[in-house]
Amino acid sequence: MQRNTILHKTLARALSMKRPHNSEGTRRLTDWLALNAPAHAKMHRDEVGNLHIDARQSEANRTLFVAHVDTVHRDEGPNKISKTTTHWRADGAPLGADDGAGCAMLMHLLHAGVPAYYLFTQGEECGGIGAKYVSDDTAFLLQFDRAIAFDRRGIDSVITHQGYGRTASDAFAEALSEALNADDTLWYLPDDTGVYTDTAEFIDVIPECTNISVGYYNEHSDQESLDIVHFTALAERVARIDWDSLPTLRDPSVKENKWDAYDDWYLGGGREATSVTSFARGHWLVDDRSEEHTSELQSQSTISYAVFCLKKK
């Protein structure tokens, strides 16, 4: 990755700071993002500190890109980064690629001239504080057909479900996967094993809400790393996608439980079930290894971090 690009500058800036919610780190990064946005973009901050950057060129531009500026760090200060030609890591702390990598990807898309609306949210790690605030504005969300986050571990997921519910159609995820894989350097597939990111807050209004693997592993732990080779290849690809040409099929008024398709398959004697496709397609070969490695660390920290977030609100 070239050092003087906005992609590299944003990533290095974000990862160099510990950024717990409502901290000096989140304020400094948000200020930096605003200062380094393209001059022509319309920009404002809302009441909870989310940074909105509108780079749409017409009403036909109906894509919302989302990344969050906060991390799971509990203290503030510098974050010492170790770099190799293939991976970045932090010394004794989470790297913060969740979601510093997403912030860098959005800035890259902005400067590449991709016409869309860009939203940098506050407090995702504390329950989606910024996204929940935005979700109350139905008129705003009705402007979009798709909400895209770059906040998923691994290197191959286009998320169709978060928690137990569907957030994006299979047709959308398949089309986006094909677009990401177009030059044969990436290998993305629809994945129904998503957990949570900001786009989950928009599913009652926006039809296609997804999360794309951005190359980090072992998030929320001091073993977190970022596959910089994959991250760079992804950045090169996403700037060439025609996002507004992607299909829009999911009906936000129809709530689909993750296991509905499996029940149909089981009761119907073997009809196709989208809920088991992630296992069949191989995502678990990546995700299980990551989750297994960090599950103990994450389970130990979940309750105490929730208390920390309450204190920071």
What are these regions (language model features)?
Residues L7-A60:
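A non-catalytic alpha/beta surface segment that caps or lines the substrate-entry region
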Residues P38-D46, K80-H87, A182-P190:
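Short secondary-structure junctions
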Residues H44, E59-P115:
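Active-site metal-coordination/substrate-binding segment of hydrolases
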Residues L95, D99-D170, D191, T199:
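Acidic/histidine-rich catalytic neighborhood of metal-dependent amide-processing enzymes
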Residues R146, T160-L285:
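Active-site-adjacent substrate-binding region
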Residues R289-E292:
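Short, compositionally biased segments
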Residues E296-K313:
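Positively charged, low-complexity/disordered segments
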